[in-house]
Amino acid sequence: MDSVILSARGLTRHFGGLRAVDGVDFDLRTGEIHALIGPNGAGKTTFVSLLSGRVPVQSGSITLGAEDITALPAHARVRKGIAYTFQITSVYPRLSVYDNVALAVPPEAGELRPAVMAALSRVGLADRADQIAGTLSYGHQRLLELGMGLALRPRVLILDEPTQGLASGEVAGFAALVRSLVPETTVLLIEHNMELVMDLAQRITVLNFGQVLATGTPAEIRANRAVQAAYLGGDDAAA
């Protein structure tokens, strides 16, 4: 049986009468690419915000490895090895590409410059280290954001709609990059591009109305009648 690096049990977060996340059980296996999909309002972003500590848990528990991290704030979870790249690009536009990544490098990484350049090389931006981040194309800003995440040397990398706004050619390059991260890094992918999800993920979890509708391989999810009903046959239901 594959080991589990990140798990949630009974994870719940309500906002007034809205059951954004409602008793979710979830397992992320070490070294996998696991996609999280669901219709608009299904609870995807709230769920990963609970995992990363950006939103406090109302009830339930979160475990990283063998450690209960439910009560830890976001910055402490980063130190434990969870990196979360945001749905909207979050680079520092007035700083250089190099300085953006340098801010993310943990003290224990050793010498700063080799760590920064290694992360930039990984995402193909080493030759743009001195460029001001705000002058990068949108696609390159998304790559920079990923480089910042990799500089943290995460055990788990959460990618929230990483291909949003990318050209088709950039999406293909991004997919190749994500594949190169595993099994060293475990990836949780929230993505609206269903073709990419089916091609990239080893397993998929479908959320609907804040609850898990199904979990399985791409083939199992594609054949699941409950998933088909939730999506009403639409191609864009994971947005």
Language-model features: locations:
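Glycine-rich phosphate-binding loops of nucleotide-dependent enzymes
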Residues: 2-239
